[in-house]
Amino acid sequence: NIYNQKRGMINKRQLHKIPMGMTDLFKATIVKEDKPLDVCLLVDESGSMGHYTMRQAREGAIAIKEALHDNAMINLWVYGHSADDGVRGTTEMIEYSSPSMQDRPMAMGGMKARCENRDGNAIVASVQRIKQESDNNAHKLMIVLSDGAPSADCYRGEVAYDHTKKCVKYAETQGWSIIQVGFSGATKYTMERIFDNWIYVDDASTLGDSVSKIIRKVIKI
C-alpha cells in the first residue's frame, strides 16, 4: 500500500484531516501478479539417446520453447542432463533456456547424446536452481523427457528407481507437478515405478505437440 495519495481508495485513518484542508487522504494498492505457470523441460542427454532419438528430442524441445517463448503466462526453463562424463559419480546439468538467459537463443541446437543419466539428481538440481530464479507462487510443472530408465555408475536398477522416485516426491513437496514423457526405449514398468504421472509417446517426432498439449491442459488454454 502507498499512502498519502490524491486519488485511490479512501484511507479511513486520515479522515480526521479533512477539516484541516488536507487532500492526500487516499491510498493506492500495488499488486504484483505472478505468472500462472513455471515450466521446466528436463531433457535426458544420455548416450542411449543416440543420434536419431536425440535429434527427435532436440527438435521437440526447440518446438516447445518456440511455442512458449512469447507466452506472457509462462516462465520457461530448459535443462539437459547427463552423468559420469569424464568424472565418475558426477551429474552434469546444461542450461539451454531460462528467463534470465536471453543471450543464446540458439543454444538448444547443441543438445546431444552424452554419457549416463542420474535422473533423481537432475530433478532436484532443477528444482533448486529455479527456486533461486523464480519468486512465483503459482503452479510449477516439470516435464521429464527420457528414452529409458536412470542409469549411471553405482546408480542402476532398483537403487536408481528408488532414488529417482524419492527425488520426484521431494520436488512435489516444493510445489512441482512432475510428468514423465517417455519415448523410444522407455517402458511402462520403469515409468510407473518412478512417476505417478507419465505418458508414452510412440512417435518421437510428435514430442513437441504432445508436451504442448500437456502444458495447455495444465494452464487451461
Q: What do these predicted ranges mean?
A:
Residues 1-221:
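Acidic, glycine-rich A-domain
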